[in-house]
Amino acid sequence: MSRSKSSGRWLQEHFNDQYVKDSQKDGYRSRASYKLIELNDKDKLIKSGQTVVDLGAAPGGWSQVAAQIVGDGGRVVASDILPMDSLAGVDFVQGDFTEEAVLEQLLELLGEAKADLVISDMAPNMSGIADVDQPKSMYLVELALDMAKTTLKIGGSFACKVFQGEGFDELVLACRECFQKVLVRKPSASRPRSREVYIVAKGYKG
């Protein structure tokens, strides 16, 4: 399919998408908010008063949901290489968290506290070529898992977007080594033809 036809199909799907319409009505910054809402409904990831780290946070759909649930007694520390408009209850650091200066900012915001939950909806810029896109996406997931190991408290949780393909089974095994329970979820808001799924890992072993 030509790129123009593919782009046209995406635009048509986007404007007809019920989750896009709902996000505009409900005041969420992206349809991705509903993915986290569903994951949380099923797996009870976020609780009032918790500390949450959101990686790849822009435009802020997941941070919005997390901040609403943790409330005034909790906090959300978010990061992205892209800018993000400020959100109540969210401390945002712009930059690549694999760079030492950015990581230090994030850890400084966390202070003595460890995170209860690390979430990541990161995805690379897709070329449409699976052999190119899959390694890029797996690299981002591995970075997110490393960050979770750095910041999570014992018993904490991790939720991360991943695309099924080469490296997926190995990633699930890697998560099982450091978490007590690992699930693979496909939220309703994930487009059916997408290879996108979410790993939900609970009970960080340390």
Curated annotation (Swiss-Prot):
Active-site residues (renumbered): K161
Primary localization class, coarse: cytoplasm
GO MF annotation: an example: rRNA (uridine-2'-O-)-methyltransferase activity
Catalytic activity: uridine(2552) in 23S rRNA + S-adenosyl-L-methionine = 2'-O-methyluridine(2552) in 23S rRNA + S-adenosyl-L-homocysteine + H(+)
UniProt keywords, alphabetically: Cytoplasm, Methyltransferase, rRNA processing, S-adenosyl-L-methionine, Transferase
Positions of transmembrane segments: none
Chain positions recorded as S-adenosyl-L-methionine binding sites: G60, W62, D80, D96, D121
E.C. number(s) listed in UniProt: 2.1.1.166
Localisation: Cytoplasm
GO CC field: cytoplasm
InterPro entries tied to this protein: RNA_methyltr_RlmE, RNA_MeTrfase_FtsJ_dom, rRNA-MeTfrase_E, SAM-dependent_MTases_sf
Family: Belongs to the class I-like SAM-binding methyltransferase superfamily. RNA methyltransferase RlmE family.
Protein function: Specifically methylates the uridine in position 2552 of 23S rRNA at the 2'-O position of the ribose in the fully assembled 50S ribosomal subunit.
Protein name: Ribosomal RNA large subunit methyltransferase E
Source species: Saccharophagus degradans (strain 2-40 / ATCC 43961 / DSM 17024)
UniProt gene name: rlmE
